[in-house]
Amino acid sequence: MITLENLIRVGGVCHFGILTASATLPLVLDWRKSLGALPKIERQLILAWASFIVLVIIGFGTVSLVHADDLAAGSTLGRAVCGFIAFFWSFRLAWQFFVYEVRDVIEANTRWLWVGYHGLTLVFIYFAVVYAMAALR
């Protein structure tokens, strides 16, 4: 049955799926080469920021899987957590649509990269909608 709780659980699984897709990013974007040109401290900062984002996504996925019932119940804390997750992914979508310039990267690679990019966009939209529904409940 389609319930908000189950939609949140699906979101939890999708968070871990995103991490799998994100693991290919350093190879696709050839981070070794592009980051190699930066001073060491800047490379370290970028890798630290990427690590923090991974930890946040692991947290979103874990909370969504373990506490989907609490998040869907409409408590103040559950709504606040869902609101933050919805805001996070809405902000990420804004970057996807208005800031990132991916055309060259996508055209220079395979059709799978195009499919993956647009597939991730759909997942980000799913996150923004489902968690906003839970937050506004």
What are these regions (language model features)?
Residues T20, Y126-V129:
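A structural signal for well-ordered alpha-helices, especially hydrophobic packing surfaces
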Residues V56-F60, V123-F127:
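Hydrophobic cores of alpha-helical transmembrane segments in multi-pass inner/ER membrane proteins
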Residues A128-R137:
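Juxtamembrane boundary at the C-terminal end of a transmembrane helix
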Residues S90-V105:
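Transmembrane alpha-helical segments of integral membrane proteins
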Residues H67-A94:
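Short alpha-helical packing/oligomerization segments
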Residues A48, G83-I85, T110-F124:
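Individual transmembrane alpha-helices with interfacial aromatic-anchor signatures
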Residues I2-I8, C14, I18-V56, V63-G74, ...:
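Interfacial loop at the N-terminal end of multi-pass membrane proteins
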